[in-house]
Every structure is written in C-alpha cells, then in structure tokens.
Amino acid sequence: MSNFSEERATMIAAGDLQEFVPFGRDHCKHHPNALNLQLRQLQPASELWSSDGAAGLVGSLQEVTIHEKQKESWQLRKGVSEIGDAADYDEELYVAGNMVIWSKGSKSQALAVYKAFTVDSTVQQALWCDFIISQDKSEKIYKSHELEKCICILQSSCMNMHSIDGKDYIASLPFQVANVWATKYGLLFERCSSSHEVPPSLPREPLPTMFSMLHPLDEITPLVCKSGSLFGSSRVQYVVDPAVKIVFLNIDPSIVMTYDAVQNVHSVWTLRRVKPEEENAVLKFPEQAGTLQNATTSSSLTAHLRSLSKGESPVASPFQNYSSIHSQSRSTSSPSLHSRSPSISNMAALSRAHSPALGVHSFSGAQRFNLSSHSQSPKRHSISHSPSGSFNDSFLAPETEPIVPELCIDHLWTETLPNIREKNSQASKVFITTDLCGQKFLCFLVEAQLQLRCVKFQESNDKTQLIFGSVTNIHAKDAAPVEKIHTMLVLEGNGNLVLYTGVVRVGKVFIPGLPAPSLTMSNMMPRPSTPLDGVGTPKPLSKLLGSMDEVVLLSPVPELRDSSKLNDSLYNEDCTFQQLGTYIHSVRDPVHNRVTLELSNGSMVRITIPEVATSELVQTCLQAIKFILPKEVAIQVLVKWYNVHSAPGGPSCHSEWSLFVICLLNMMGYNTDRLAWTRSFDFEGSLSPVIAPKKARPSDTGSDEDWEYLLNSEYHRNVESHLLNKSLCLTALEVSNAKDEDFSQNLSLDSSTLLFAHIPAIFFVLHLVYEELKLNTLMGEGICSLIDLLVQLARDLKLDSYLDHYYRDSPTLVKTTGQVCTIDQGQMGFMHHPPFFTSEPPSIYQWVSSCLKGEGMPPYPYLPGICERSRLVVLSIALYTLGDESCVSDETCQYLSKVTSTPQKPQAEQEENRFTFRHSASVSVLAERLVVWMASVGFTLRDLETLPFGIALPIRDAIYHCREQPDSDWSEAVCLLIGRQDLSKQACEGNLPRGKSVLSSEVSSGTEAEEEDDGMNDLNHEVMSLIWSEDLRVQDVRRLLQSAQPVRVNVVQYPELSDHEFIEEKENRLLQLCQRTMALPVGRGMFTLFSYHPVPTEPLPVPKLNLTGRAPPRNTTVDLNSGNIDVPPNMASWASFHNGVAAGLKIAPASQIDSAWIVYNKPKHAELANEYAGFLMALGLNGHLTKLATLNIHDYLTKGHEMTSIGLLLGVSAAKLGTMDMSITRLLSIHVPALLPPTSTELDVPHNVQVAAVVGIGLVYQGTAHRHTAEVLLAEIGRPPGPEMEYCTDRESYSLAAGLALGMVCLGHGSNLIGMSDLNVPEQLYQYMVGGHRRFQTGMHREKHKSPSYQIKEGDTINVDVTCPGATLALAMIYLKTNNRSIADWLRAPDTMYLLDFVKPEFLLLRTLARCLILWDDILPNSKWVDSNVPQIIRENSISLSEIELPCSEDLNLETLSQAHVYIIAGACLSLGFRFAGSENLSAFSCLHKFAKDFMNYLSAPNASVTGPYNLETCLSVVLLSLAMVMAGSGNLKVLQLCRFLHMKTGGEMNYGFHLAHHMALGLLFLGGGRYSLSTSNSSIAALLCALYPHFPAHSTDNRYHLQALRHLYVLAAEPRLLVPVDVDTNTPCYALIEVTYKGTQWYEQTKEELMAPTLLPELHLLKQMKVKGPRYWELLIDLSKGEQHLRSILSKDGVLYVKLRAGQLSYKEDPMGWQSLLAQTVANRNSEARAFKPETISSFTSDPALLSFAEYFCKPTVSMGPKQEILDLFSSILYECVAQETPEMLPAYIAMDQALRSLKKRDMSDTSDLWQIKLILEFFSSRSHQDRQHTYPKRGLFINSEFLPVVKCTVDATLDQWLQAGGDVCVHAYLSGQPVEKSQLNMLACFLVYHSVPAPRHLPPMGLEGSTSFAELLYRFRHLKMPVRALLRLAPVLLGNPQPMVM
C-alpha cells in the first residue's frame, strides 16, 4: 500500500470528469430527415431483437448494423467566435449516414446545433476548411487574406461546400477520392488506387495520386513534388506513386506527412505554392525536357530508390518522374471532353479549353481517368487495358492547354530505415506538440509496435524552412496532444495514462472515478500485441477488416455478437465507470486542455487536464524563470512545479502563490520549514507531500513541531484575545522562542539543488517582473506577494541596494532586519552571475523620472514578451519627451536592453551621452507618431486606464494633442485610443462591404394604401427633412410625379353638348392628360434613383401606370378603352418601359442581387413584358446585370421581343462601360449588320434594336478609340437607304445613334486619334454636317450599298437632315474640352442671311452646343456670353416678340431670323448647363433662370407665332433642363416653381415630349432624393448628351429622331455627393458646419466656403480639402490632395460622416443660434463663478453616464456636510474642469492625487507609488519638452488645471517639511549614516527619500556625512549624485549639523 501512496504522490489529478456522448448522435434521432430505418441502424442490435419478432430479420439487420455502425464519426475543434479570437469551447462535426451535424458550444452553455446538412448519398468524410478569396495567388497573400470559412462534405462522386456566409458550392469529382485534407491553401485530395491496378500493355506514365483545389470554384489540379535527387540537384514531378499515402497534414506550419507502403518509411514534406519555374519544368513537353524518360526508366529509378541502404535517409523522393506526361493524346474512349474537371489519361487532357461548367456529374471516376477504380464499372477491363489504337499518335491538340499545378510538396525529412522493418508500420495517429519551453515535436503513433515516435523540429533562423532533429521513441498504445498546457497524454501499454511535455515524462494522470490500472487490470488487460478490435465505434471499419474487396467475410454477425455488450453500454445513458475491468482503451478529440477517453466498456468520458498555473502572478513568474533558464533546467523546474500544483487535492487559487514560493525556494536549496515567513503560509487543508519530497512521511501520531506550529499560528493569537479566554482567567501559554532564535542563527542553503546556481538570474528577472507589475494598477496584491520573496533573496545575496529600493517602494512591508540564510563564500562560487545582472536595481519610475529631467540613464532591461508594459512606457517616454522618432521603428533600441542568456557588452559603455531632447519633429508629429505606434502594438484605452496616473500622463497628453486634429485615414484602433468615436466608427464602416447603411429608410408599417404603390416611399425622409426643413417640397414633388392614381378630368358640360359628346369630350381630355402621365416615370426614376435595397426573397414592387381618370363631382371613372374615341395603338408601350426602368433604378448599386432574383422578377403576363424590359435596362445601369447568367441573356434575346432586346442590350453595355468586353461585343454585333461579315446571313433585326445595339457598341468601347469600331460607326452615320424598304424609316435615330456611338468611342481624343489619320474622321463628319457628294464606300460593306433604294431618291448626295445631328454631336464629343478653335469655327452659326437659309434652325442649337463644348474653358456663366454666340446679323435684326407691328423687309426672312435666334440662345444655355452641371453655380443659375423666364414670356407674346410655339416650347424645355442640370439634386425652389407651372399646362400644344422634358427637369432637380448630383467628366457629358438630346418625341411611340430608351443614360452621369453628418452617440443624422477648400484655377484663387451639412459637395476634383468645423463638433479634416478615395467611399455609402458633439455644446437642432451653449463657455473661460455652478447643470454639457453619476453621488450637497463640504467643492470644480476642458479621463487622476495628498497629511502612506506619480506629473510639467510645447501651442495640451498643480506641490513640500522639523531630521541622519530608524517613522522617511530623490547611503561621498562646513562645499561634493538643489537645502541642516533647516 505504501508503494501506492508514493505513486499517488506524483500523480496529476485530472479534473471535471464528464460522460461524453457526441452531440450529433443525439440530434440525429430527432432530426426530421432521420427516417425510421436510419434510426434503427443507429440502435444497438439488442434493442432491435426485443422489438422485432423474426430472428431472420435480426440477422439481416445486424449485418446492416455492422456496416452502418462504423459510418458514425465525429471530430472536435477549438471554438472560434465570430470576431475571430479563439474562445474556450468545443465545436463538433458529426457524420452519420448522409447527415452532417455541426454543433457549437459557447462560454456559457452546452453544445447547440449550428448547422445540419443532409446530402443525397452517404457522407464519406466531412471537414472544416478555410478557403482564401483572392485574385492574386502569391504566397504573401496568405498573411493578410480574406477567408471564406466552409464545411466540406465528401460524397462518392462530388464534394459539397457550404460557407458560413450562406454560399453553397458543389464540385464534381473526376475520380474516386480516398481521403481529403484541409490545408492552408484549400483542399488536398488523394485518389483511390486499387491495389490490383494492372499496368497497361503500352508503357505509359502512371497517373497522379494527389490533387489540390484552392477554392470551390477552381479546378482540381495535380500536386507536384520536389525532392533532392541522388546527384544533389532537385527534380520536380507529379506525385504518382500509389504506395505513398498521406497520414497527416498540418496547416501551420504547412507540412504533410506521407507513408510509403513499399519502403515502410514516413516522410515529411512542406506544402507550398508552386513557383513559376517549377510549373514550367512540369509542363514541358518531352522534346524540350532535356532528358526524355519513359515509364520504364522512371520506374527503375523508383526501384533504385527503394533499395537504398538502410542507414541513410533517402533524400530523393519516392515518387516517379512524370515529365513525359504530355506525350500521349486523349484516349478516344474518354467522354470527358465537355467536363469542367479534367480527365487525366495524360496532362494534355487536363485542359481548360473544353471546360464549360456543365455536364459534371455524368462520368464515373473510372471513365474520367482511364483507370480501374472502386466503382465496379463494366468497362473496367477494357479501360485498364486499352488497345493501343485508343492512344493514337496525334500529339497535343492545339487548343488544349494543360492544367497548371497550384501546390507543391517539398521534401524535408524521411525517417531512417531500421534493420528489420515491419510490414504494417503506418502511423495511425500523427500530431504536433510543443513542450513547456516551446520546442516542437512531430509525434506519430505506430500502433503495431506500440511506439510513439517523436521528432524534434525547429524553424531555421531565417524562418524559411524547418529543420528536423533526432527521433525519440516512447512506449505507447495511444496518445493525444494537450495544446493549452504544452503537453501530451500518452496511454501506456499497461493502461496507465501518463503526461509528457515533449519527450520528458511529467507524471501519471489520476482520474477520480476510474480505478488505477495497477489495481484492477491485472488480468483483464489484453497483451500489447493483441489489437483491440471490436471496441469503440468510431474506429474506421477498414482498419479492422482491411479492404472489403479482398477479405471475404464468412459471417460478420458472430463477430459482432461478441461486441454487442459494448454497443449496449455505448448507448446506455447511465453507465458507471466502476464496473470491474473497465480500462482506458484510447484517447481522442483533444481540444484546449480537454480530452476524451474511450473506455473498454465502450463508454466515453471527457476529462480536463489542469493548467500550469491559474493566477496571473504565478504565470508571469514562471514565464520569466522559463525565459532565463537553460531549456533543460527550465523543463525540470516546470515539471516539478506542475506535479506539485496538480497533485490530487491541489491548492486553491488563493494559496497557489504560497505553493509556488515554497516550491521555488525548495528548488533553490532553502529549507522552507525553517524559514519563518514561508512557515506561516496558511494552506487550506494539508499540503501535498510532494512539496518536500525528501522528507519521510510524517507519522500519523503527530509530533512536538505540530504543537509549536499551532502556538505560533494566527489562530492561536485569535483564541488568546478571545473574550471567553479572559473571562475564564486562563493564563497565556508560553510560546517557545527557542525556535525563532534557532531560525535566525544557522540557516544555510543546500547548494546541490537544481536552481542554486541560478538564484541571481532568477532574482533579477523576478525583480523585472516586479517593476512590470508596478505599471499595472490592478496588480497591487501581486506586488505585495512578490516583494516578500524578493526581499528574502536580496538579503541572502547581500544586495543592499535592492533592499533599499524595496524599502522605498513599500516601507510597511519591508522590515529593515529579518531572517538571513547565509551563503558562504565557497557556495557563492557555484552561483552563476549573469552578465545582465546590475548592482543598481533597475527602477522604471526612476528611469522615467531621469528621462523627464533629461539626465543620463542606462538602457532599461526588459524581458521580451513578459515585460511588455515596461517596454511600452520606456519607448513612449523616449519618443514623446525626448523626441526620438527612431526609437519605435528600430529593432535595436538604445533605451532598452533585452535580457538574454547570451553575454552582452558591459553596461558601462552604453551610459554616455544619453537623453538629449531633439527638436527634430513638431509636437503634433511626435504625438501622432506615438499614438499610431501604440495602437499598432495593440495598446488600448483599457490598458491606459490601468497604467499609474503619472506614467500615463505623457501618453494622455499626446492623445489630447491628436484628438483636436486627427488624420481622417487613421485606423479604427487609433481613433478609439484618442477617444474619437466618430472616426473609429467611420473607419469601422469603411472596412465593411457596401450594403444597407445607417440611413437606409425604414418605411413605417402604417403607411396609407395610396402611398404604398406610388414607387416613392423608399426615400430617406429623415435626411430629406434635414435638407429641406422649411417646407413640404418633397411631398409636392411626389404628388407631381406619381402615376399610380387616376387623374382628375375636369370638363364643363355646356348646354349644347349632348351626353355622348360630353363623354367623348372627357375622353379626349383624358387622352391629353395621359400624354403627361406617360411622361412621369422617367422623372420618377430620377427622383428615386438608388434609394432601395430589395429583399432577395421578394419581387421588386413596380407601381402601376394608371391611365384612367376620375371626373368630378361624382368621381366617375373615365377610361380610354370604351371605344368612343380613337386611341393610338401601343400608346402606353414605351410608358410601361419607362415605368419598368424607374422601378429598377430604385435598386441601390450595393444591393445583394443575383441572377436568380432577376429571373424571379420576370412577369407572368405578356402585357408586363415592356415593364420587365425596362427593369432589365435599369439593372444594367446600376451595375447588376453583369450577374445575369449568359444563358438567361440568350434566352431573353431569342424571344424576339423588341423592347426586351433594347433594354437588355443597352443594360449590358452600360454595365460594361468602356471595358471592350468581347462577349458583349459579340452579343451586340449580331444586332448591327455593319459589324457582321458581308457573307453572313441577313438577320431580321428590328430598327430600334439596331439603334440600341449601335449605342451599346459606343458604351462598351467608350474612350478606347478602337479603330475598327470607329470606322464602322463613321460609315453608319451616312448609311444610305437600301432596296426593299431596308433602312428607310426612322433613319434619323440610327444616324444619330451612330454619331453618338462614334463620339463615345473617340471621346475627348481630339486630334490624337492614333492610327486613324487615313479615316479623316473630322473631315468626313464635317461633310455629313454640311452636305455634299457621298464618298465611295470602302471596305467590306461596299457590296451592300451598290443597289439603291427604290423608295427614297437621294442620289449620291448626302441627306443632311439625316446625318447632321449625329455628325455634329460626334464632333462635339471627339473634341470635347480640347479648346480646338479650328474645329469650333466649323460649327459657328452662319453670319449671312443666304447661308442661314441652308441650315435648319434646330440644327443651329446642336452646332452652338457642340462649339461651346469644344471651347469648354471659354464658357462663362453670364447672359453676355450667351448672347455672344448669336451672329451679328441676327443680333442686329432680331425683333422683339412683344411688339404689335412687325417690321417689313424684303431681304430678311424674319421667321428664319427669330427661329435661329431662339435656337442659338437655347444651344448656348444647354452648353452652360453641361459646363456647370451639378455645381449649383449661382451666376449660371441666375443667367439661365432669366432666359427661362424670357422664353415663358415669349410664349404669351403677341408675335409668338412668328417664331412658332413649337420652337419656343422646345427652347423653353431645353433651358429648363439646363437649369435643372446646374441645380441637380439641390431641390431649388425657383426651378421647382417653373416645373410645377409647366406641369399644370396640359393644353393641345403640350405634347408628350415637352412633358417628358419638364418632368426630367423636375427629376434632375431632386436627383436620388437629393443624394445625387451630376458629374462633368467626359463620360458623364457623353451620357447626358444621349439622355437630354434636345429633340423631344412628338408622341409616346415616337422614336424617329431619338430612341426614347436613351433618355435613361443620365444614370451614368449621376454620382453620390450628399454628405450627411451622423451624430455618433445618438446615431441620427444632424446638422454640422463644414468648410470646403477649392483648389485654385485659372478663374479663381484657392478659396474656402462654409456649408451647412447635410449638403451636396462640389465635384471632388475641384476640392483641396474638406473639414468639419468646430466649435460644436470635434474637428475632422479630410485632405483630398492625398487622394479622393476616402471621401468617395464615404459618399458611396450614403454619405454618412460620423461627427461627435463636443462637451458643453448642443446640436444645431436643439440650439440653432448657439446661445444655450454659453453656459459652458463661462466654465471653459475659468470664471470665478465656476465653483458656484450646480452639479445638476452638468447634463447640459455632457451625456457621459459615468460623469453624470459622479455628479449625482459625489458632488451633490446633503444637509449636514461639515468638513466634507470642502471635498465636495473640490470634486465639483474638478468635474467642471474635466468636462469643460473635454478631458473627462483625467477625473480619476485628479481624485487619486487628492487622495494621495490626504493620506500623506495623515502620515499613513503604506507605499510610495502615488507619491511617485505626483512627482512624475510635476516633473513632466516642468520638463523641457513640455515647456517647449506650451510655448508653441499655448491653447493645446494643458491637461491639468494650472491652479491645481502648484497647490499639490506646495502641500507635499509643506507636509514633508513639517515632518522634517518634527523629528524627521534625526531619522534622515540615522538612515544616511546606516543606523536603525525608529519603526513609526519608516513610512514618512521613505516618502521623504522618494520625493526628494535622496541617494542611498552607499552613494554618499566617501568622507562620510561630516566634514562639510558650508552649503557651497556640500553642493560641490554632491554634484555627481544628480540631487535637486531643493532636496540638498533640506538635507543641509542634517549633513552640516546645523539645527536651522534651510527650507525655501
């Protein structure tokens, strides 16, 4: 039994024992898909027996069970929370049958199903895999990539992948997969290879066996391997050896372990991306491949490899060469021509050329690979032994391009071959484990030999490769890593569970509830050689039975009967572990520090292995000790500690530290039983006997020592002082003091112990840990605990300087005398004093203090990874107060010295020339640098709050500096650190994908029915009510543009009208009104542009176009379908199209839309087809049509529906703007005969579709100056009419379309049309414009134009009426903004009456427009410039339309003159509109508004008929559109009034086209609900020319001069420019003042303008910067000179700019004039009344709940205050100070200083930390750097109230001086002369020494204290001690023996 207890002593107690049942198994039973049969299959056989009577059935069912049973499997992994950090819970992936269940735990609760998947066939394998989403496939991508986390489910023929974002992929598998592995890059597949693959008669290369897939949408590509050959050079080849199997794959480091079944060896490879040169080597053809090897040579090489001598590790790969893989062509029998995934009869077949993504499922693996596989294909043999004919000699087909391999495995290590190698030595389990010192081991378990082989490996110095070392064998039956505590659990052959760290044994694991194997398992345990077959379900069947093909089972059932008991208990819920003979059978599913044990009775238990330490203090100390000790010693220390800590009945968290101290001291050679302070440790319960393992076990009877211990205990003292004790008059027991004296005399250390030699090193690192803890205000308790240990060690090592340091830090804790353990000289020799050990204690406070004073200090020693705060503080002080910017960027830093075990250069050299303040950078630069650096190293506000307030002050100062004017492009972390939530939220939003934003409108559910279907309820009313807050203009616009309600038909019935005539009258009136109604959708589309995010599961709501009316007074319906009047056919078809476009344009570009949704919206009824056609066009304009599958596009076009074709062609072209996309070009060319070869079949393409296709070509080739396209389009402008009515109607629109398209293709290229000089483009266009003889048609289409039209007799002259508009606009677009005067002069209006007669007046509009667009920079926004475009002859003879009498003239045609006049004016106005589009330029606005008013007056003038009402209406419409362009998106009231007036005009002269123009103007005015404006880029001008072409349709079906669909191209010119400030605290839009700075141009200097946001910004290229102005909101500057991208991304996400209200300010809504904020100003200006403020008023300054609570509880006076009133006043003034200065974070610092002063006054300061902080604050404010800062920025910084600091300083000085005079001088003298000091004075003495920087006695001048006679001499003698003069003045009386203190 004693033997057992000793074993028990070094045991490790496992905790938290729970029965384990995979969660998925339970869930399966209740899963709706789990049908009865599957349920039965999962039940044990015995249950079936009882439920079913027939025994025969049971037999068959049991047979099923054995197959099905093994299909159950599961795996666990560490939980990954959404944010990405690892959380401490399990995730389980469970597979059974065709179901996969993924369940997740969480920190608080048990597992719950996360997702469950059911697939069609049996799941072979399921796994987690992260795919990388990236275009660039370079290696560096894997460092900072976007991951797509997926679950992959392998079935026999395909692989399903489901991402957590909800994306599903399915990849067909071209072969049978034996195994799939998740890698760092994607998936790795192993192909099934049957063992009896017969080599074909023809010698040919073997097939690859391993493949990779980098993304579910990528192809499966073969894996390449690279291995050193026998001759030293490495060779690259495919992995083809079927004997090589993967046994393990690890993600980080990315390595693969393989097993060669022939050689019986394991190899390790690194998995990486293929390099380009390796790709080339593998893909080379045999002729080029240098050495041509055929299959025979390659196999002989492998044979040679396999016969390598046993001793050496084969460097060459066990893989065959595969360089000749291309030599044979595709087998004729392979049907894989049309498959996406390749056939691998050879690599030529691995071709991308024939892989459309269809037809994947139809081929079995055998067919695809021409090899035998597990699927028993009837063709099997014929495929395996293909006759030679099938491999015909044709070489690589020209179009087949081989599949390029993606991944490569690079050989790292192969195990050496022993003398005899067992056949079956494949590793059954492989894992990587790290030992407690960070050394890594690759462990693989060879079950057959009961061996765990551990290979040590490490990274090379340059981190590029792994170096493998020696192999250690551990006897084991099973093993599993315990990651969290860097150990592994090993199940030994005898059933013991043992913990190892690396290859060092830690101890046995004791599992409560399971009997120890040594007791129970003497007979039960099978011999190690017997494989444990039938136990535990999850062992794969193949392992037990071998391949089913080969082994013929006589009867599997009896075998199973044997194990049915196990299966029973497996499902038995309440199984007990105490059954006799239960032993651990295997270990599985390790996660974190939990692991599952499979027991021999089939049940499973999950245990937790205890952690190395739970308290932070012990963890840190262990880390430091581990860091400094040699690895082998460190391992021993950690193992000993772990045994002590984790013994059964181990310590609580409370006593963990005590246990650690005793354990550590024991290992150092102390006898802790005799050391007074460790002896008094109170352990809860008895100590584990492990602590002092050398002692014999104490007898149970007790001893004298126990009694002594009790008398010395705290318990005894409590009993003694108890009342009962006194009342009974018991005499006090004599406590024997002999022991104590005994203690103090002859204590010594045992120098033979493990850590004796390392005591100084351990002491030093623990001291550094102590200094680190001082920088964390939460670790006060830890400091007290650690100081005891440090003081003991410092005493014994005779380190007085350290003792003095600890005394000054904690005077109450450090006794000046204490128990010393003597270390004699001889022993001292054994001690190793490391080079980094300094005689002066490193002190972080002292270091910072010296730094602030500008004194020299040695570099501060720090432990990398442990003392991170010390490093941070040192570097931030060096950066901010010394101005050394390089300190944070350099790896080696002069301010820090890394503590390492390797020797360093002596410290003395490094001490010279230190710490000079550099003036290199400005303060703001230093502050920014500091803040950005701190955020980059992960420092957060929470860390800042735990720094002591004095240390934190410089950092807070820097933060305060940055907060005023931060950079707009700082990261989220930096913005959070400086307390700018507005910026951090902006940065955070910037990283999110564009989607539904803060401002997405939420329609209230209670909207009225009438509003529901007008198509305008998705606008953001909250923002619009801010933009237009004074009136209801938005409702007005909505009323004007709605087309879903019937119109009012007001007709008066005159007496002479019969009822029938009256009805006709009403219907005629309705027909007139319908002209207007049909024009409304175009305007509505503009108004609601991009305002809606559709729900992908719902169809898009399209408001109906209502063409009925209501006649008052009885609201009777008036309808056009009554047949009373003639209604034009198809009248509403284009109106429906426009309605569809308007509905589609509501969809915002960032919406989640896919092809399925687009098709889903297709209407059921044919009459809605036009609407859908418009919807398709709209989707193209907002960029969504690219998602429509090619198949669907083809489908729509073959229907032959004209409108659908128009919408689709224009839509896809707009979506592919300027891309020259070939597939779209092909699509368009079919519809443009001129682009087809002359011999092609003539297709019957409707005219309008041709027009759309031509414009489409222009869009796709926009700005490319593509020669062929330009040539064809140039010819098409003047295309003559052909025979048989071909191209005879509506020629104008086609010619115009060709002109516009040509203009787009050569947009803005001007005279730089490279390679087109022979086309004479400008001359040809000029000819089209003015007329002349038609040129001879060149090129391939000349045949077409030989036969003339029989209908139209034009002869060989150009018909200018047809070609002029297109040619004019083409010239305008080609020479747009080029200021080319010679071309512009061609376009000048004629200046003689004769020439005027030759030009149609409306063409003058186009010419004027074109000329002005070319001379872009000459356009000026005034009427003088407009008039300057009118030729002199017209100006001189222009008539006033208001005159009654018209002048008579024989020479002049007044009609021509006046028409020419109005059209030229209109053209100039239109060009003005283009020039200032979206600018809201006031001069342009007033100029255009004047002309609009003039035209309105002309219409009612007496002589209007001379000009003609139609012409005047056209010109008015053009001017109105120009006006709307300039004011786009602004909702200007004057323009709205004009539009509203014209909306009401519905007389006979107002046709459909004019209504269209007026409502387009209205739409532009409110573009996108005020969120969008127009751009003036070349592309935008081109789009606007198409959309606003100044010839309007006469009626709703008129497309003669201009295709109506083009009216919507304005979308391409719209850009989001609305900036909406959103208050970051309330998350609501608000007003904010912004200032934009315009760059200087030739017209104006750089200017600034203030705008009140929400507002439309000017075009970004005009701006230099934009800033949010104070004083209400924190300032924010966006500098556009650095790039416009940041602001563009803000504007594209609804323009949300987060702003933060400053303290004491109210928003513009609450306080428009800013008067209420004055209250805050008085406080901020530090008036004397500030103190008198009431705490209640604070709520108007700040909304911070913490500050409000502080005011509530600490600043409100109560009735009887008394002395507390003073504190209350102080707190109130501090609070106001903080709020008004906007530094609420300083409140705790103020209060801490106040508390420190109070405790100093009371003289009960237990430690000097707070005094240090006050000292550091005073030093910071008097430091040179701060003084300079104050000088440069008098208004910034000034953190602490200037009145508060002097008060603090005076209070501290006065208190210490009082103490000095009241007897303190005696203590100081005693201290300095090394004599004992009175105990009661120790606290104040320490405060005095710290505050006045008094040096330690040993630093005083050697002559001692006496000897100086004068103060001057004293100053001289103390000069090297850097003592402040004020301190010397106070010391002088003590030192000079003068009783009069010289206090200043």
Curated annotation (Swiss-Prot):
Entries under Gene3D superfamilies matching the protein: Leucine-rich Repeat Variant
Q: Superkingdom, according to UniProt? A: Eukaryota
Q: Which residues carry this modification: Phosphotyrosine?
A: Y571
Identify residues that carry Phosphothreonine: T291, T537
Question: Low complexity bias: where?
Answer: 323-343
Residues annotated with Phosphoserine modification: S51, S60, S313, S341, S343, S355, S362, S373, S377, S547, S555, S680, S686, S688
Residue ranges for the region (Disordered) are: 312-343, 370-395, 991-1014
Sorted alphabetically, the Gene Ontology cellular component annotations on this record are: anaphase-promoting complex; nucleus
Single GO biological process annotation from the record: protein K11-linked ubiquitination
Q: What residue spans carry the Polar residues bias annotation?
A: 384-393, 998-1007
Q: Is the Nuclease keyword given for this protein?
A: no
Record-linked InterPro entries: Apc1, Apc1_3rd, APC1_C, Apc1_MidN, Apc1_N, ARM-like, Proteasome/cyclosome_rpt
Reproduce the UniProt comment on modification after translation: Phosphorylated. Phosphorylation on Ser-355 occurs specifically during mitosis.
Pathway listed for it is: Protein modification; protein ubiquitination
What does the sequence similarity comment in the record state about its family?
Belongs to the APC1 family.
Self-association state and partner proteins as the record states: The mammalian APC/C is composed at least of 14 distinct subunits ANAPC1, ANAPC2, CDC27/APC3, ANAPC4, ANAPC5, CDC16/APC6, ANAPC7, CDC23/APC8, ANAPC10, ANAPC11, CDC26/APC12, ANAPC13, ANAPC15 and ANAPC16 that assemble into a complex of at least 19 chains with a combined molecular mass of around 1.2 MDa; APC/C interacts with FZR1 and FBXO5.
- Biological role: Component of the anaphase promoting complex/cyclosome (APC/C), a cell cycle-regulated E3 ubiquitin ligase that controls progression through mitosis and the G1 phase of the cell cycle. The APC/C complex acts by mediating ubiquitination and subsequent degradation of target proteins: it mainly mediates the formation of 'Lys-11'-linked polyubiquitin chains and, to a lower extent, the formation of 'Lys-48'- and 'Lys-63'-linked polyubiquitin chains. The APC/C complex catalyzes assembly of branched 'Lys-11'-/'Lys-48'-linked branched ubiquitin chains on target proteins.
Name used for this protein in its record: Anaphase-promoting complex subunit 1
Annotated organism of origin:
Mus musculus
| Gene coding for it | Anapc1
